[in-house]
Curated annotation (Swiss-Prot):
Gene: thiE
Organism encoding this protein: Phocaeicola vulgatus (strain ATCC 8482 / DSM 1447 / JCM 5826 / CCUG 4940 / NBRC 14291 / NCTC 11154) (Bacteroides vulgatus)
Catalytic activity: 2-[(2R,5Z)-2-carboxy-4-methylthiazol-5(2H)-ylidene]ethyl phosphate + 4-amino-2-methyl-5-(diphosphooxymethyl)pyrimidine + 2 H(+) = thiamine phosphate + CO2 + diphosphate; 2-(2-carboxy-4-methylthiazol-5-yl)ethyl phosphate + 4-amino-2-methyl-5-(diphosphooxymethyl)pyrimidine + 2 H(+) = thiamine phosphate + CO2 + diphosphate; 4-methyl-5-(2-phosphooxyethyl)-thiazole + 4-amino-2-methyl-5-(diphosphooxymethyl)pyrimidine + H(+) = thiamine phosphate + diphosphate
Keyword RNA-binding tagged: no
Protein name, per record: Thiamine-phosphate synthase
Protein EC: 2.5.1.3
Length: 208
């Protein structure tokens, strides 16, 4: 990584302590410049209200704003892009709706997933989980460092060049060894929000 700076994606999470908006604001204050709004099992009108607020906040910080799952909402409010989970709309279908101007990320757990998203026109891959995480239901098999090394190696052999972002149960201490596998960046949520000072924790991560 240039300047040894971690490319950090922050995924919003509603907790007893922080709202979606507060969680994003703290990550932005700490230097993160990529926010994904993730509101599973929430009516789309509520997601839209939160998305519009967060979109304005991200613009203030010059940050990329991506919404999980809601392709039509991304197009409606002109967010920067969408992240699609394994049970969400296929990447190719989303690309057909959004065209080339929007960012589309796909979720992968295997090299075959990566290859499928690459052929479908994904801009980046969220790859995981690194380990068990309590912030997500229906986890795919845990990858660990060896899983990432294997996927990165197979990508090189197949001449597939696509940013790969590690996700799932990652702690600050894990990040250096994960980055050494050839991973492009890290996606975090609970690790930051469980810290005593989420802003300071984000700064520490950004400066690893």
């Amino acid at each position: 990584m240039e300047d040894k700076t971690v490319e950090l994606q922050f995924i919003t999470h509603f907790t007893d302590t922080y709202s979606y908006y507060d969680s994003a604001r703290m990550a932005l204050e700490g230097g993160c410049r990529w926010i994904q709004l993730r509101m599973k099992d929430t009516p789309v009108d509520e997601v839209e209200r939160e998305a519009i607020r967060l979109q304005g906040l991200c613009k203030d910080y010059g940050a990329t704003f991506v919404i999980d799952d809601h392709v039509e909402l991304v197009k409606k409010i002109h967010a920067d892009g969408v992240h699609l989970g394994k049970k969400d709309m296929p990447v190719a279908e989303a690309r057909g709706i959004l065209g080339k101007e929007f960012i589309i990320g796909g979720t992968a757990n295997t090299f075959d997933d990566v290859k499928m998203h690459y052929k479908a026109g994904a801009d980046y891959i969220g790859c995981g989980p690194f380990r068990f995480t309590t912030t997500k239901k229906d986890l795919s098999p845990v990858l660990g460092l060896e899983g990432y090394r294997s996927i990165i190696l197979q990508m090189k052999e197949a001449n597939i060049h696509l940013p790969i972002v590690a996700i799932g149960g990652i702690t600050l201490e894990d990040i250096p060894s994960i980055m050494e596998t050839g991973i492009t960046g890290i996606a975090l949520s609970g690790t930051i929000l469980r810290a005593k000072d989420p802003v300071a924790e984000t700064k520490r991560i950004m400066n690893l």
